[in-house]
């Protein structure tokens, strides 16, 4: 991502003048559609067709070149064939145009010559400083200004454009506009839409960074196929967090097939999905699984309301719908609690005796003949101190919809708590009226519950990590270990060096001594005392247990001497006659974790935690965080593991020392951050947890170095 030039991005978002290079007089052609759309919807700025063969385009004066235009040009849309795009963008930069949109395909997404062409485009961008959206994109639209430099068909339905507080960025052009159209149909108003295409210059992260600063944007939505600039995206997330503007994101490529398709479609590298998932959760980005969830969340976030808690009160015409809502709400992390008796008595005064004043409140079908009941019930619900969110479940009832909607609107305007309506069946007219009033409306209780669950997660999100580097790190030891390994031309540290490295960062390690031969191993065991482990210590063999290179719980001189000799024989057979031995004190603790660090191509150094030992791949229970982390964020990673109940008291076993484990995770995250240029991967496996107060100990560690630059 280039250096942020917010002025250029703002002129892209709010262009007062737009030049169309290669503008066609034919409004049906792709190169003619931008002018037709902006004329139809009333663009308020200057529209400047560039066509060397015509004096007029679609009734507008045409210009032979950019140089023939007087005054500033905020934005150019380059509607030229791919082989003419580079010259066109260069002309724009020469003319002083700050931003351009490139619609043509045939660049990096097709490989070969297209990649070379995209590199030429990037060279021009680097030389001139012009900002470019695309190539291989269908443009953008700003509904506030009716600026529509796009050739989309999303506006061909003849309807009005619904402007609103949501701005949407999509790496996919066509599918992005499908989502835009669905949002409009669902009553979700959009302020800006931008398609980033191949991201030769402007990335999703940078576009979101520009949008988050606009007053008209209260909610950001993103459809992602890959993330090139993960750290920049997280910087935007931090800014959005400060402004209380949610980022709602759908990222495809969870499966290998999806990742391959995403890469071939937009020439983007789909990073490891688990890293994206952990990074976005850590920074408050709301990740959603598809278009339906994205739009549903958009509806409940768009009015800017937040919830103080997870307690949902439901009023339902149907008892069955209320039960379904309660189930779905619970599945999405919400609480549906019966009201206390005093409040139930108040509700019982306004509903039939055969209804239920508990929560969910069953208003019964009497509501159809007495729609005023809903107003009275909602007044009580709004006053109820144990209600954080409100859901009203209705269905059919077209003839009674007027007073019902009036009651809902009155309640909605009288409270700042989130209030949603589920209106199932009927003609759809009640839902459209609610949409026009700005009240979130759904057809399915489950979808409403899922959206409210996401709203609660965001509203109650923890603070972003504010990690402070520990002041007891021994940087001199760290530099010495790395210097020695580099001078020897090695690609990994052996276990002893790796353990010394993490110990320099304050990670407790099991006592150990290296030994050159069986006699030295016996002497080391005597010094350590108690049962010991004897392991191969090799600069070349990484996973010792795979070749039988570990002996555990050894006592007695002869037992240790025999085991040591056998291990050296194994090393010779494995091709490392220079291998040594590591004699290590057996450690306490019976809960095994793995804590690893790695460098992600998009997000940089990350930390991976999970339940470990030799079954780490089988258990596949892990969480990812972006380094550096503080202790609180590290603890949240650990408690997010599926097996996190093992940290508590289980069948008489005392609780594990979770705080000590979190401290180790935080310290290793600083190692990942500090040594990102030196350490490609590092695994502590296992990290043994003892009971509360007895701490943790790292038993085995392996660090892989980055390849030296040529």
Regions found by a protein language model. Give the residues of each.
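Catalytic-core regions of core metabolic enzymes
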Residues: 1-710
């Amino acid at each position: 991502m280039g250096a942020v030039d917010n002025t250029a991005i703002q002129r892209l978002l709010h262009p007062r003048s737009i030049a169309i290079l290669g503008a066609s007089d034919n409004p049906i052609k792709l190169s003619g559609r931008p002018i037709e759309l902006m004329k139809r919807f009333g663009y308020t700025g200057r529209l400047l067709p560039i066509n060397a063969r015509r004096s007029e385009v679609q009734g507008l004066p045409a210009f032979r070149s950019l140089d023939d235009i007087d005054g500033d040009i905020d934005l150019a849309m380059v509607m030229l064939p791919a082989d003419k795009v580079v010259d066109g963008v260069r002309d724009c930069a020469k003319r002083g145009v700050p931003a351009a949109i490139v619609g043509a395909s045939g660049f990096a997404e097709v490989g070969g010559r297209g990649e070379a062409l995209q590199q030429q485009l990037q060279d021009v961008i680097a030389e001139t400083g012009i900002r470019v959206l695309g190539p291989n994109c269908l443009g953008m639209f700003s509904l506030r200004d009716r600026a529509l430099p796009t050739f989309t068909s999303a506006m061909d339905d003849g309807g009005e454009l619904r402007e609103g507080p949501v701005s949407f960025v999509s790496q996919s052009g066509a599918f992005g506009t499908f989502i835009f159209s669905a949002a409009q149909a669902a009553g979700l108003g959009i302020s800006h839409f931008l398609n980033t295409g191949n991201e030769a210059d402007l990335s999703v992260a940078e576009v979101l960074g520009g949008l988050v600063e606009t007053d008209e944007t209260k909610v950001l939505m993103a459809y992602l196929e890959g993330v090139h600039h993960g750290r920049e995206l997280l910087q935007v997330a931090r800014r959005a967090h400060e402004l209380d503007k949610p980022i709602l994101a759908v990222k495809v490529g969870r499966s290998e097939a999806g990742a391959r398709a995403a890469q071939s479609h937009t020439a983007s590298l789909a990073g490891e999905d688990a890293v994206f998932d952990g990074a976005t959760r850590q920074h408050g980005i709301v990740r959603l699984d598809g278009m339906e969830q994205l739009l549903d969340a958009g509806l409940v976030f768009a009015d800017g309301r937040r919830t103080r808690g997870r307690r949902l009160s439901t009023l339902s015409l149907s008892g069955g719908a209320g039960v379904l809502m309660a189930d779905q709400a619970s599945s999405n992390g919400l609480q549906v609690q019966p009201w206390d008796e005093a409040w139930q008595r108040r509700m019982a005064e306004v509903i039939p005796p055969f209804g239920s004043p508990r929560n969910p409140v069953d208003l019964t079908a009497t509501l159809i003949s007495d729609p005023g009941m809903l107003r009275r019930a909602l007044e009580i619900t709004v006053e109820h101190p144990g209600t954080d969110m409100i859901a009203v479940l209705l269905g059919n009832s077209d003839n009674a919809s007027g007073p019902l909607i009036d009651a809902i609107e009155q309640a909605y305007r009288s409270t700042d708590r989130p209030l949603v309506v589920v209106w199932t069946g009927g003609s759809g007219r009640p839902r459209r009226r609610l949409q026009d009033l700005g009240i979130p409306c759904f057809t399915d209780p489950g979808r409403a519950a899922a959206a409210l669950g996401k709203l609660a997660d965001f509203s109650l999100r923890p603070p972003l990590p504010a990690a402070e580097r520990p002041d007891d790190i021994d940087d001199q030891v760290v530099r010495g270990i790395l210097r020695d390994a580099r001078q020897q031309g090695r690609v990994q540290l052996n276990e002893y060096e790796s353990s010394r490295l993490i110990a320099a960062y304050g990670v407790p390690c099991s006592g150990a001594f290296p030994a050159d031969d069986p006699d030295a191993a016996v002497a080391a065991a005597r010094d350590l005392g108690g049962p010991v482990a004897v392991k191969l210590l090799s600069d070349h063999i990484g996973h010792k247990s795979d070749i039988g290179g570990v002996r555990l719980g050894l006592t007695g001189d002869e037992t240790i001497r025999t085991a040591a000799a056998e291990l050296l024989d194994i090393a010779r057979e494995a091709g490392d006659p220079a291998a040594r031995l590591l004699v290590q004190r057996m450690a306490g603790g019976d809960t095994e974790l793995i804590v690893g660090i790695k460098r992600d191509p998009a997000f940089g150094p990350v930390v991976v935690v999970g339940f470990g030992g030799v079954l780490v791949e089988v258990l596949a229970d892990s969480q990812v965080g972006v380094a550096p982390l503080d202790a609180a964020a590290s603890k949240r990673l650990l408690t997010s593991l599926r097996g996190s109940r093992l940290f508590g008291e289980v069948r008489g076993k005392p609780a594990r020392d979770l705080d000590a484990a979190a401290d180790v995770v935080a310290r290793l995250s600083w190692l990942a951050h500090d040594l990102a240029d030196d350490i490609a991967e590092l695994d502590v496996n296992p990290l043994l947890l003892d009971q509360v107060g007895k701490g943790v100990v790292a038993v085995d560690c392996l660090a892989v170095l980055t390849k030296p630059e040529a």
